[in-house]
From Swiss-Prot:
Protein name according to UniProt: Fructose-1,6-bisphosphatase class 1
Co-factor binding details: Binds 2 magnesium ions per subunit.
Keyword Lyase: no
Gene for this chain: fbp
Homology family: Belongs to the FBPase class 1 family.
Catalytic activity: beta-D-fructose 1,6-bisphosphate + H2O = beta-D-fructose 6-phosphate + phosphate
Organism field: Vibrio cholerae serotype O1 (strain ATCC 39541 / Classical Ogawa 395 / O395)
GO cellular component terms, semicolon-separated: cytosol
Top-rank EC class of the record's enzyme: hydrolase
Cellular compartment(s): Cytoplasm
Cited InterPro entries: FBPase_C_dom, FBPase_class-1, FBPase_N, FBPtase, Fructose_bisphosphatase_AS
């Protein structure tokens, strides 16, 4: 029987894949692993503790912050600061980027951008939620505080990205630009084990994931694509199946494994889309491309978009390569 590899062992094995390998990125990923375990523990007992429901505060996007959002945000910040590999973080839950002021942190080479708890409004109904993270090498001089430019880098500059999905089992999925690998958490041992090696998304899928309750507000091209998905064309594998959980990590994870497309287009009320380029779209785009899929805003490759602000939003289409190409065709054919 083949020995099961832990996340820690796998990271060490793959360390030579990292440019300028020095062990720092390995240690940074270990910090994320630790914070994920802590957050997973709290999520699993959320119904028994006073940490579900809203905190009474809004984040910078004007969205009501959930108590676990804030808890996860603090735990990930603390874990990342403690190891001295990160000079600062930008979080969906913070108005501005946070610089770590310890001298060792100023000498760190990396910044982290994160959505500490995606889909947190679903916790009280026991739906899967997740953490999304993105890692960049800083562009400002080492030894100085991080600058805005360190965080406003296009997705094609990411050195690592991933997510943790807290569901029926907890998984950590990540890439460093050399494929995508998934690790399942064994709570009895407190260890992540390699369970999904070299994950690949099928070029064609049969699942489309979109909140069809907003159909009337969608661009014409997206409406036409939805009708295309629903057409009865058995020789082409249609109609496709509609599956939408409302938690990006959960919808993305299913489509990565099964093949499919996730769509969050612009609407009349959100002309730039609703998902955040830096905290959600870029890391998911890096993962999907490494798994053989595509991510687009309907016109441009997501990872080629140059960010102009920390909380920038974009339309988002991500998943199986041929499905993303098809929705781009509809958007080009039916411009609004």
């Amino acid at each position: 029987m083949q020995k099961m590899r832990t996340l820690g062992e796998f990271i060490v094995e793959k360390q030579h894949d990292f440019p300028h390998a020095s062990g720092e990125l390995s240690s940074l990923l270990a910090s994320i692993r630790l914070a994920a375990k802590i957050v997973n523990r709290e999520i699993n007992k959320a119904g028994l503790a006073d940490i579900i429901g809203a905190s009474g505060n809004d984040n910078i996007q004007g969205e009501e912050q959930q108590k676990l959002d804030l808890y996860a945000n603090e735990k990930f910040k603390a874990a990342l600061e403690a190891r001295d590999q990160v000079c600062g973080v930008a979080s969906e839950e913070e108005d501005e980027a946070v610089a770590f002021n310890k001298e060792l942190n100023k000498n760190a080479k990396y910044v982290v951008l994160m959505d500490p708890l995606d889909g947190s409004s679903n916790i009280d109904v026991n739906v899967s939620v997740g953490t999304i993270f993105s890692i960049y090498r800083r562009v400002s001089p080492v030894g100085t505080p991080p600058t805005q430019e360190d965080f406003l880098q296009p997705g094609n500059k990411q050195v690592a990205a991933g997510y943790v999905i807290y569901g029926s089992s907890t998984m950590l999925v990540y890439t460093t630009g050399n494929g995508v690998n998934g690790f399942t958490y064994d709570p009895s041992l407190g260890t992540f084990y390699l369970s999904h090696e070299n994950m690949r998304i099928p070029e064609n899928g049969k699942i489309y994931s979109i909140n069809e309750g907003n159909y009337i507000r969608f661009p014409t091209g997206v409406k036409k694509y939805i009708k295309f998905c629903q057409e009865n064309v058995p020789e082409d594998g249609r109609p496709y199946t509609s599956r939408y959980i409302g938690s990006l990590v959960a919808d993305f994870h299913r489509n990565l494994l099964k093949g499919g497309i996730y769509l969050y287009p612009s609407t009349q009320s959100h002309p730039n889309g609703k998902l955040r380029l830096l905290y959600e779209c870029n890391p998911m785009a890096f993962l999907i491309e490494q798994a053989g899929g595509l991510a687009s805003d309907g016109v441009h490759r997501i990872m080629d978009i140059k960010p102009t602000e920390l909380h920038q939003r974009v339309p988002f289409f991500v998943g199986s390569k041929n499905m993303v190409h098809k929705v781009e065709e509809f958007l080009e054919t039916y411009p609004d």
